Amino acid sequence: MRPRATTICSLFFLLRVLAEPAKNSDFYLPGDYLLGGLFTLHANMKGIVHLDYLQVPMCKEYETKVIGYNLMQAMRFAVEEINNDSSLLPDVLLGYEMVDVCYVSNNVQPVLYFLAQEDDLLPIQENYSNYVSRVVAVIGPDNSDAVMTVANFLSLFLLPQITYSAISDELRDKVRFPALLRTAPSADHHIEAMVQLMLHFRWNWIIVLVSGDTYGRDNGQLLGDRLARGDICIAFQETLPTVQPNQNMTSEERQRLVTIVDKLQQSTARVVVVFSPDLTLYNFFNEVLRQNFTGAVWIASESWAIDPVLHNLTELRHMGTFLGITIQSVPIPGFSEFRVRDPQAGPPPLSRTSQRSTCNQECDSCLNGTLSFNNVLRLSGERVVYSVYSAVYAVAHALHSLLGCDHGTCTKTEVYPWQLLKEIWKVNFTLLDHQISFDPQGDMALHLEIVQWQWDLSQNPFQSVASYYPLQRQLKTIQDISWHTINNTIPVSMCSKRCQSGQKKKPVGIHICCFECIDCLPGTFLNQTEDEYECQACPSNEWSHQSEASCFKRRLAFLEWHEAPTIVVALLAALGFLSTLAILVIFWRHFQTPMVRSAGGPMCFLMLTLLLVAYMVVPVYVGPPKVSTCFCRQALFPLCFTICISCIAVRSFQIVCVFKMASRFPRAYSYWVRYQGPYVSMAFITVLKMVTVVIGMLATGLNPTTRIDPDDPKIMIVSCNPNYRNSLFFNTGLDLLLSVVGFSFAYMGKELPTNYNEAKFITLSMTFYFTSSVSLCTFMSAYNGVLVTIMDLLVTVLNLLAISLGYFGPKCYMILFYPERNTPAYFNSMIQGYTMRRD
C-alpha cells in the first residue's frame, strides 16, 4: 500500500494547484451523496500541441464529442429521476460532479479530485477502511485505456467504478481491478457477434484494421484468436495511424493511410473489420473517399458503430454497406426532451456548498452540437445511454440497501467505499423491463445489436438488423439488410468459393480459406465433419459416384426368377428333368431287355436317379444364397454329377474288359466279376469325391460371401464361395479325369458289336462335358463379374442334358422305335458276327 500512497502524495500538489470555481450547473448537483462522472465531451482532432505537461489540457479547445455530452446528460437525467422517485432513496438527495476527460488527456486529475475530501486533502494512510471520499462511486470513463488508469487509483480505496462502454477483457481481472464493474458486454461477446455475423453471410475472407492503441491491438488479437478456431481468414491486418491528442498527423502517417487504402483496393476481400476509436477514422475515411474505394462491407466496432459525426460524412453511403456492433436500444421515457433542454432555461441551479471544484467542467458548444445532431440521436435510440442510466440506478439501489431504506426512510450515515461496492455486487432489479445484475466478472449481460447505417432521413440512421444474446452466445432475428450492390445481392467475400458437395479442398497458400476444389473419385465420399481435405473410402458394401458427399448401398446381384437367362436355364432344367424321368420309366418297363442290360442294368437306375436329383438342385442357384443352398451347390450337386460320370467311365471300362481283356487276362477279369469291380470302383470314386468336397467346404465355408462386380462397382455379387474360381478347378479336376478315362475306354471299344458299341454316345457326352468345363474355367479366369453364376448354371444344365439325352437318349430311341433289335436273338447274332470278324 505504501508505494501507491507515495504516488498519491506526489500528485497532491498538482491537485491543489488545478482547483478552480465551477461555471456550469451541467457538471454539478449538490446532494447528500455525490456520484462522480467521467465523460469525453471533447477530443483532439485539430492537432493542438501542449508543450507544458504540468498543465492539464483545456478540453474546450478541442472538437466537441456529441456522444459524450449525450452520455453525460443521461447521468444527469438518471440522478434527477431518482431524486424525484419517492420509493428509491426516500429523503436522500443524490448529487453528482462530472468532468470532461478529453478522451485520454485528463484522467488523473479528476480521479484525485474525486478521491479527495471536501477540503481537497488526500491523506496518506495505511488503512483506508474508514476513509470517506468526495464521491461514493464513479461512472465512467468510456475507453479501456482511461478506465485502467482510473481503476488503478480507485482500487486502492475500493471505490466503486462502473464503466459504460469499455469492453477490454483485461477489465475482467478482479485481482487487478477489484472495484471495477461495467454495464457493457465484454469484448469477447462483441467479437463473437462479429464472427457469427460473418459466418451467417459466409464471409470467410476479411481485412482487419486496428488502431495503434491498446483498444485496437487487444481487440485485433482477440479476433485473430477467435478466427483461429473457425473458417474465416484474415487477408491482411493493418494498423491505422493514431492521432495523439497532442500532435498533428505527420507526412509519414498520411502516406501510411494512402498505402492502406491502396491495399484495400487491390485485395479480393470485401469485408473490412475496423477496431479503432472514432478519432482515428476521420482522416482514414477521407482517404477512402478520395481514392473512391467502393463495394465493401464495413463492420464497425462499438467505439464508432453509432458515432453521429462519422455518420454525418454522407458520402460514405457510396462506399458500401456499414454494419456496427453496439449495445441494444432501450428507450428511456423523457430523455429525448431532457437531452436538449437548456439548463439556464430550466429551474435555477442550486448553489454549491463547496467553493472548490476541478477544471474541465465547461462545454459551451455541447448543447448546440447536440441540437444539430438531435434527430440522429433521437432516431438511433438510446443505446450506450442506457448503460450510463443503468449504472447510476445500480449505485442508487446499492445505496438504498446500504442505508436501510426499505421501510420508507433512510439512515443518512457515512458511506465507506468498500461497503457500497459490496452492495453493488448484490444488486438485482428490473429497469425498463431489463434485468440489472452483475456476473462474477463484474459484467452486465445486456444484449448486443447489429445495426446498419442508413442515410434516408425518414429512417433510423442506425437500423437494427440482428440481435446477439451473450448468455446463449447466439446471433438471432437477422432481418433484411439493404446491401449497396446490384439487385441488393449479398456481397461475396471469399478467397475461394465454397466447394460443392463431394469435393475436397486442396490448400493454396498459407490460408485455410484459400483452396482448390477437387472432385472425390468414385468409391469415395467427403465427410466434411471429419476431414474436408481428404475423401474417405466408402465401406465395402457401399459405393459412390464421382463428387459424392455420401455413399449408397451397393445393389446385391444374384440370379432372380424374373430374369431372362434364369428363365431359359429353368426351362432347360425342366426339360432335362422330364426327359430323364421319362427315360427312367422306359428303362423300368424294359428292365429285362438286352438293351437295358447292355446299358448297365441296375447302374442305369442309379445314374438316372442322380440325374434327377441334380436337376432338382438347379433352383437353389436362383435367389440370394443361404447356407442350405450353398451346401447343395458345393456338396450335393458335385457329388451326384461325379457319380454319374464315374458310372459311365466304369461301364465303358467293363465293356472293354468283356470283349477285349477277358480272354487275355482271365484271372483279372474273374476277380473283377467276383468282387463286384464296378461297384467297388464307384464306391472308391464316391469316397474320393466326398473327401474333396469336405476339404473344399472346410477351406471356404458355407456362409454366403460378397464380392464387387469388376464391371460395375455399384453391384455387389453374392456367391457361396469367395474363391469360386479356384474351387471350380479343384472340384472339376476329378470329373475331368473321369471324362477322359471314359472317353478313352469308349474309343478303345469302337470295334465292338453295334449293340455294345457306346463309343460315339459316351464320346459325345464326355467331349461335351470336357469342352464346356474347360470353356467355363477359361471364361472365369478372364472374367469375374455377375455373369459367372449364370454361366456356371447354364454349363451345369447342359452337361446334365448331354448325359441324359446323349447317353440314354439313343437307347430309348432303339427301345421305342426298333423293338426287333431289343431281343436276345438279335444281340447274340451281333456278338457272333463280331467273333467271326475277329477270327
From Swiss-Prot:
Membrane topology annotation: Multi-pass membrane protein
UniProt feature coiled coil, ranges: none
Segments on the Extracellular side according to the record's topology features: 20-566, 624-635, 703-727, 782-784
InterPro entries: ANF_lig-bd_rcpt (IPR001828), GPCR_3 (IPR000337), GPCR_3_9-Cys_dom (IPR011500), GPCR_3_9-Cys_sf (IPR038550), GPCR_3_C (IPR017978), GPCR_3_Ca_sens_rcpt-rel (IPR000068), GPCR_3_CS (IPR017979), Peripla_BP_I (IPR028082)
Glycosylation sites (chain numbering): N84, N127, N248, N292, N312, N368, N428, N487, N527
Cited CDD domains: 7tmC_TAS1R2 (cd15288), PBP1_taste_receptor (cd06363)
Recorded superkingdom: Eukaryota
Signal peptide (residue range): 1-19
Keywords in alphabetical order: Cell membrane, G-protein coupled receptor, Glycoprotein, Membrane, Receptor, Sensory transduction, Signal, Taste, Transducer, Transmembrane, Transmembrane helix
Subcellular localization(s) per the UniProt record: Cell membrane
Protein family membership: Belongs to the G-protein coupled receptor 3 family. TAS1R subfamily.
Protein's name in the database: Taste receptor type 1 member 2
Native organism: Papio hamadryas (Hamadryas baboon)
Gene symbol of the encoding locus: TAS1R2
